[in-house]
Amino acid sequence: MKISKKATTIAIVNQKGGTGKTTTCENLGIGLAMEGKKVLLVDTDPQGSLTISMGWQQPDELPTTLSTLMAKAMDDQSIPPGEGILHHAEGVDLIPANIELAGLEVSLVNCMNREKMLKQVLEGAKHEYDFILLNCTPSLGMLTVNALAAADTTLIPVQAQYLSAKGLEQLLQTVQKVRRQINPKLKIEGILLTMTDSRTNYGKQISNLIRQAYGKHLKVFDQTIPRSVRAAETSAAGKSIFQHDPKGKVAEAYQSLAKEVLADADRQRKLSSERAR
């Protein structure tokens, strides 16, 4: 009997740095865990930004990371359940990354089925978790393509400023290409406006511009993530915003985003089961 797939895999992607990908991956993941869901976070960035942000300050010293698991997949070796998974105090699991992943990305180029190595690594985990969140590298290289090939949906954090919105076109083209060539079921979960400042006219103007430009074709999340000094401090502390500033507006925003993502996932599940009848 075939086990029906369980986890919803979300790639958090934007080739531009500084848009709040890592912060969103960590806090959305922990927000979903607070709603009672089993969550796996996967760091696909050779800089190990998510790994460090979650408190593993020396990722290069970790014995097993994503590159270890992907190398096994490339060699057609089996991956024991739970291998390389770290447990975080706030109730989520993590597959960490370090600089070895940069070398692995280069060797992927000559690999058969190279776009699907991450998908292969996550195959077993799909049945163990409700959500798998992939923190993508700030580029559109082979690691990001692997993340898009492994994902059910993609969530795009966009910093609320003019230049950030420009790179969005290029990213959307990449998503379309992956959909056409590798992963026809890939959906866009939505655009998440980060570092918003609703107190200034400029901030409101940008948010409105992005909603007008993309809102007709794509979901732009109602919930935005406000700019906050306290949120910027969390990545240095190895704690999520829920630990660092639980009563603050950013914690509230990520909790609300988690609820929005859950509602979307439930809606998708209902649609899929209706189609299957």
Residue positions per predicted region:
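P-loop NTP-binding core
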Residues: 1-277
